């Protein structure tokens, strides 16, 4: 009877953990997949913006992690960075996906210039008129950018909110814990014509980590102890949080640029609805800050 009783308790505990762990992320895959696995909640807003009057050539030299933070560890010292070092590639992809910009290769400009130099040197070395003519046709003038996008990841705050809950009754129980981090991105548009900073935008994304655990602890008979533990942890990838923050910054930069005349939409009347939604979102965010008591801390009145 005792075995049946404990079996029922174990089954109930397993059922609770399975039902709670359902929405958690499952990391198991059989093979690599094509394309992106993670589509951010901002990506649809970015790609569904009304089209521009014409695409704007822009340059991105470096969009760096400026936090200098290493991965948090409670046991050993880690020399792995907490933030992805590929933010430049993420920004270029976001600019490309928006449909508003023509990103130009500037991060590895030396490689591009070296390859063009090789083509010219080969045509001169062999003194072949046909080869020279072909080289001149291939090597079109490089496109210059009117705007440079600068900025970087300027903040990564860990453990800004932590908490949990647990309960145990006669050796049977479980617990849930969570931790909230935050990543902050700044993006600015710089005029190539005169070096003026045209606009600066900021985007913030929280990173959620959660742990669910359960256990069973009972003496089933004399000197016979039954102990079972199980659990699962879900950590939102920091890279995906950075991607979402960058996409949000690009989305906001497009709208702010339209407002001050940096670039123009194809249909200004259609774009007015986008600006209205954007302004409403900013007002709601400000209200949330004030209601949370953070407005004075950030200097918002």
Predicted regions: what they are:
Residues 57, 61-159, 184-186, 190-200, ...:
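N-terminal segment of the mature soluble domain
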Residues 154-171:
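Charged, amphipathic alpha-helical segments
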Residues 17-19:
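C-terminal motif of bacterial Sec signal peptides marking the signal peptidase cleavage site
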Residues 1-10:
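Bacterial N-terminal signal peptides that target proteins for export
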Residues 21-54, 157, 165, 176-301:
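C-terminal/domain-edge helix-coil "capping" segments
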Residues 136, 171-175:
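Extracellular loop and loop/strand-boundary signature of outer-membrane beta-barrel proteins
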Residues 2, 41-45, 133-135:
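Short alpha-helical segments and helix-capping/turn motifs at coil-helix boundaries
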